């Protein structure tokens, strides 16, 4: 069995689970999330735990088993604690500011870049170069962070760009003159 999939998922107090066929809905203090579980995988609530099981040991079912358990676990974590990704901007003249609920970046382009906050995502800015993305859906928070990072990827020669907090950029040595 999958080491990830066979571990039961603890359901903390204040979280309600609604299983309707292949759809799992999780309600908690921070909001509601729902996810469709792939067809051969079943989710059952046993007391204060959720058990994810598969019908047989076919290769596809084994691969979906751990995935399904992780999706359910991430939903429970999201509605109880939420997810936050902190990011930093490096570079002369690069900055970020909050415009209403949206982020406005100055990244060396001829125009400012505006990132709109989708439903369920909140932005926070700390100074001109640090900001955070928060929400209850781990996939959505990570995707927004990746999209923002893609606006100005780190330059390996000068170290300029947008990066995750604590991320180390591998620097390259530039050309040497004659």
Curated annotation (Swiss-Prot):
Q: Which GO terms describe its cellular component?
A: cytosolic large ribosomal subunit
Spell out the Gene3D superfamilies in the cross-references.
Answer: Ribosomal protein L6, alpha-beta domain
One GO-annotated biological process of the protein: cytoplasmic translation
Q: Which domain of life is it from?
A: Bacteria
What keywords does the record list, in alphabetical order?
A: Ribonucleoprotein, Ribosomal protein, RNA-binding, rRNA-binding
**Alphabetized Pfam families for the sequence:** Ribosomal_L6
Q: Which GO terms describe its molecular function?
A: rRNA binding; structural constituent of ribosome
Q: Sorted alphabetically, which PANTHER family does this protein's record hold? A: 60S/50S RIBOSOMAL PROTEIN L6/L9, LARGE RIBOSOMAL SUBUNIT PROTEIN UL6M
What is known about its subunit structure?
A: Part of the 50S ribosomal subunit.
**What functional role does this protein have?**
This protein binds to the 23S rRNA, and is important in its secondary structure. It is located near the subunit interface in the base of the L7/L12 stalk, and near the tRNA binding site of the peptidyltransferase center.
Give the family per the record: Belongs to the universal ribosomal protein uL6 family.
Name-wise, this protein is Large ribosomal subunit protein uL6
Q: Which organism is it from?
A: Corynebacterium jeikeium (strain K411)
